[in-house]
Amino acid sequence: MGSVTPIPLPKIDEPEEYNTNYILFWNHVGLELNRVTHTVGGPLTGPPLSARALGMLHLAIHDAYFSICPPTDFTTFLSPDTENAAYRLPSPNGANDARQAVAGAALKMLSSLYMKPVEQPNPNPGANISDNAYAQLGLVLDRSVLEAPGGVDRESASFMFGEDVADVFFALLNDPRGASQEGYHPTPGRYKFDDEPTHPVVLIPVDPNNPNGPKMPFRQYHAPFYGKTTKRFATQSEHFLADPPGLRSNADETAEYDDAVRVAIAMGGAQALNSTKRSPWQTAQGLYWAYDGSNLIGTPPRFYNQIVRRIAVTYKKEEDLANSEVNNADFARLFALVDVACTDAGIFSWKEKWEFEFWRPLSGVRDDGRPDHGDPFWLTLGAPATNTNDIPFKPPFPAYPSGHATFGGAVFQMVRRYYNGRVGTWKDDEPDNIAIDMMISEELNGVNRDLRQPYDPTAPIEDQPGIVRTRIVRHFDSAWELMFENAISRIFLGVHWRFDAAAARDILIPTTTKDVYAVDNNGATVFQNVEDIRYTTRGTREDPEGLFPIGGVPLGIEIADEIFNNGLKPTPPEIQPMPQETPVQKPVGQQPVKGMWEEEQAPVVKEAP
């Protein structure tokens, strides 16, 4: 194709000095690719795969950096002495420049992840991704070479060593098993996930290189086999959740489920409905954390990294941001821990989502069938389709647990473990004092908007007519608060039940009636003060039997704690999922529309966890 004009990207609301640090710079490049790939329909879209890309990037950066600047209190993820070649750290071969090693590792990893493969076993490679998408992603990488602090020396031994490190990680962890939806069909029945009533199908181009040509219908089910089949990164054991109310061992928990229905209607409904009791500030909280795969914004792992960037600079060890090796080491370790935890949180939350296939509130309330509980015409506030003229939507994957809650539980618990004893001291299950100021979400930055016409990728978003989202500047007192608000924000959008985040008794105010929780005079749910919250409640599970966490927050915390306690070690090969053919389910009832591709990528759609 001919010359390509870069998509105009709105400026990020953070100090420009952040990217004078080369660890933060390459993190920034990874985050730019996240928002661009979701804008152009490129590879690695959706929450779990976009988290995986950042995890692979920061493991490559971590080992490239610490091979040249060895730490005294931990080791690299790969080992130079292991007998298993798949986990062997390459020889430095004279590499002695950490800056160039990190550049080589980052550029090679990001190119391997986002550029069109030269060789691919699929007989129709890249069928779902346009040439323009790859070209736009290539422009981001080309620009990074020009803007990298200290420059890029591709011929140096250090740069080539970084490339070698990235190659080992890519071969080890680029595991596309389960990303395709081919062979999946929804399971019918009460409590079961199904097509979204407001977006039952999307119309996609038959030829991705001809977006204005013929269209075909496509039903979206994002990565149904991913959690059970893909390689984990650094967890050392299995992680399970309790059964949700209404299913299996908790089939008799009708009071808990019925009260959750009431909360969903009151707190997650569309703004115009009389039954909606959510406050304007709670509506803002729902939008603030969204990052639902929208144009120019991307997915939640991008926002979590933006927050961690601000935390990292706020609590840096030395004042010199650009040149301090102490800060470089600090950031390289922090982002590897955070993004590996985020990756494994995505794997285990997707494993449990598709294990239970629990319906979303939009389906649950509309299909309830009981006149005194459900509403067949109910609408949610919904996941925002920011920078489009589309209506809000229900994510195309099951509810329990919340991906947001699991990702946030893992990310912010890892931050809490990393800074404990440095910013202050706290127990692992109680509030911290990691406060941050001036945190702005791109969902509410005074720039991004709800458009009145289709998005134009050739024009700056500032020049496109629509309702501009108000710029809201936030302060948070702790990572404990970040973790909690991120989780409950999904209740306010109506895309999640309260138990998708955490057990009701851990976050709500009990009443004298079992499994019924307090409301204010307006009928809105009353949440506990964040400093009083502890995620301690456990519930039963049919298989395996036992007591397990309820919801995404404690699942994410559990994953982060395990990774941190074990010092960021690889998941042992013997406990990785066994290679298997993608399961094929026989359709029940109406034959679903065929998937639009059979490729090693998740569907390129707008999605929310």
Swiss-Prot record:
Cofactor: vanadate
Official protein name in the record: Vanadium chloroperoxidase
Keywords: Chloride, Metal-binding, Oxidoreductase, Peroxidase, Secreted, Vanadium
Binding site for vanadate: K353, R360, S402, G403, H404, R490, H496
PANTHER family named among the record's database cross-references: PEROXIDASE-RELATED, PHOSPHATIDIC ACID PHOSPHATASE TYPE 2_HALOPEROXIDASE DOMAIN-CONTAINING PROTEIN
Subcellular localization, as worded in the UniProt entry: Secreted
UniProt record similarity statement: Belongs to the vanadium-dependent haloperoxidase family.
Chief location: secreted
Classification via Gene3D superfamilies: Phosphatidic acid phosphatase type 2/haloperoxidase, Vanadium-containing Chloroperoxidase, domain 2
Active site: H404
Record carries keyword Metal-binding: yes
Keyword tRNA processing: no
One GO MF term attached to the UniProt entry: chloride peroxidase activity
Assembly information from the UniProt record: Homotetramer.
PTM comment: The N-terminus is blocked.
Reactions catalysed according to its record: RH + Cl(-) + H2O2 = RCl + 2 H2O
Described purpose of this protein according to its UniProt entry: Catalyzes the oxidation of chloride in the presence of hydrogen peroxide to hypochlorous acid (ClOH), which in turn can react with a nucleophilic acceptor (RH), to form a chlorinated compound.
One Pfam family it belongs to: VCPO_N
Residue ranges, annotated region (Disordered): 569-609
